[in-house]
Amino acid sequence: MNKIVLKDYLLLSNEEHKELLDIRNKEYIREVSLDTSIIEFINHISFVKGLKNSDRKFFAIIFEDKIIGGVNLFDTKGDIKWGIFFLNESNIMIKSIVPLYFLDYIFKTYKKEEIFLDVKKENINTISYDKNLGFNIFKEDDKIISMKMSKIAFESAKEKPFLKRVMKQLNKFDFEIISYKGVAF
């Protein structure tokens, strides 16, 4: 069976951090990120060290022993926000099932009724995909769209033909979350 590992940034080796940062600093990822700057290695390591006593969780997505992206969640005033990025060349099925798995993980682990995200207005593909997952726009300004999804909307979205196909594929993968046991929220 294929395996996907979500490995906490706090547990990555220096080489894994470099691999992850190389992906994060790609122009096509920076263009759609809320922070568009190129992140220097020393600043990245400093950021990661700050996660030890934080309510933010960041995971490298590893498939076939290669980092292919990252996913995160954090608590903002009691609300869970999440985000994700992938290498362009990553398998499209992996890019579809990891969000489903991770959102399910958030609902089950953190016992929240809603999950939130912020996305740049020009990131049309992400907005469309998030709507397919069950997210709805609840606030926007000239640059950012804020979306939320209830647990009920997520479960309902899984009944759509596209997500049903993805859910069938999800069962063909093993997932492992390797997490630093710091602050829990």
What are these regions (language model features)?
Residues N14-L21, F41, I45:
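An amphipathic alpha-helix signature
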Residues M1-E19, K26, F58, I62-F185:
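Acyl-donor (CoA/ACP) binding surface of acyl/acetyltransferases
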Residues Y28-S46:
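Conserved GNAT-fold acetyl-CoA-binding loop/helix
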